[in-house]
Amino acid sequence: MPVADTSQLISGVAERYASSLFELALEAGSVEAVGADLDRVQALIDGSEDLKRLVVSPVFSADDQFKAISALVEKFGFSGLVGNFLKVVARNRRLFALPGSIKAFRLIAARHRGEITADVTSAHALTAAQETELKATLKGVTGKDVAVNVTVDPSILGGLIVKVGSRQIDTSLRTKLSTLKLALKEVG
């Protein structure tokens, strides 16, 4: 299966799981609580190479994945919807779709709240004040509340890359240097 087909499959699985979880959370009136728990799950994945390996590696059996996720649910107190969701995903051998499901849940919840999502890449972590100012600026441009997903990528050297929907604003130092380099090649 080509790589593009694989990522579409993962995306489709992730979106179906996220959509189902969102509907259940909406019925229970716990969308915000579920979102907060999913953020905690993502932080755990990001902070642990072992957990990351468990999530992405097909080497682990369904039983091993289920036992590990059950222990995680117990240890960190994920109860109710998120605890059951994690166990179902593990039991069905779909842990590979967990990060995508978390991202899809965030997007569905934001859309439900009337927000749009901006993916921001920065060379350094943004302070709370910078993030607040960025949200206000983007709200002024789009006319909607904006949820910001910040990714730190030191390779952009400085500035920001902001993606909102199909629009991208690239003020990164890396892009400016590349543009300058091309301009100098044309002159020389």
From Swiss-Prot:
Predominant location: membrane
Subcellular location: Cell inner membrane
InterPro entries: ATP_synth_OSCP/delta_N_sf, ATPase_OSCP/d_CS, ATPase_OSCP/dsu
Bilayer topology: Peripheral membrane protein
Key words of the record: ATP synthesis, Cell inner membrane, Cell membrane, CF(1), Hydrogen ion transport, Ion transport, Membrane, Transport
DNA-binding keyword on record: no
Function: F(1)F(0) ATP synthase produces ATP from ADP in the presence of a proton or sodium gradient. F-type ATPases consist of two structural domains, F(1) containing the extramembraneous catalytic core and F(0) containing the membrane proton channel, linked together by a central stalk and a peripheral stalk. During catalysis, ATP synthesis in the catalytic domain of F(1) is coupled via a rotary mechanism of the central stalk subunits to proton translocation.
The protein, known as: ATP synthase subunit delta
Taxon lineage: Bacteria, Pseudomonadati, Pseudomonadota, Alphaproteobacteria, Hyphomicrobiales
Gene: atpH
